[in-house]
Design a protein with these regions (language model features):
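Short, surface-exposed loop/strand segments
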Residues: 1-61
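Extended hydrophobic secondary-structure segments that form protein cores and membrane-embedded regions
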Residues: 6, 33-36, 64-68, 117-121
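Extended, charge-rich low-complexity interaction segments
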Residues: 54-76
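Activity-critical C-terminal alpha-helical subdomain
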Residues: 68-133
Length: 133
């Protein structure tokens, strides 16, 4: 499986490589250098360009996007209801960016679209690093 990463920093990308491989429990090829943004707002801004690049110019299977929640609204089960969107929830916003960007992508190289996985670390990704301690 070929996976691309989009995160807020190089340190986050390094940790994500280990985390994604452990979660998926399968051999992974990471697509090029990770795609990085500087902070939360930039992740949402560059994500459409990253998705277009991955879909049309690579054979990536998935894009993993991780941002910190910081003080934003935390995603809850209520947010998963059909048609529901919370404008201050980072998970809702990133899912919407993916949906709006990829909805008109044609099938290419035998795949419908690049899959996505979005993680919002609460309160920050450093908390994930401490999991299990």
């Amino acid at each position: 499986m070929k996976v691309a990463l989009l995160s807020e920093s190089p340190a986050d990308e390094a940790a994500l490589r280990v985390l994604v491989a452990a979660v998926l429990r399968r051999p992974l090829d990471f697509v090029g250098p990770g795609y990085r943004a500087r902070g939360w707002p930039n992740v949402a801004q560059v994500m459409p360009a990253v998705l277009r690049h991955l879909h049309f110019n690579t054979d990536a299977d998935a894009l993993v996007v991780v941002v910190d929640a910081d003080d934003s609204v935390v995603h809850t089960a209520e947010h998963d209801r059909p048609g529901y969107f919370h404008p201050h929830c980072r998970m809702c916003r990133l899912r919407a960016v993916h949906r709006q960007t990829t909805r008109r992508f044609p099938a290419i190289n035998g795949r419908e679209r690049v899959l996505r996985s979005v993680g919002v670390a609460v309160p920050a990704i450093e908390a994930w690093y401490l999991c299990g301690r």
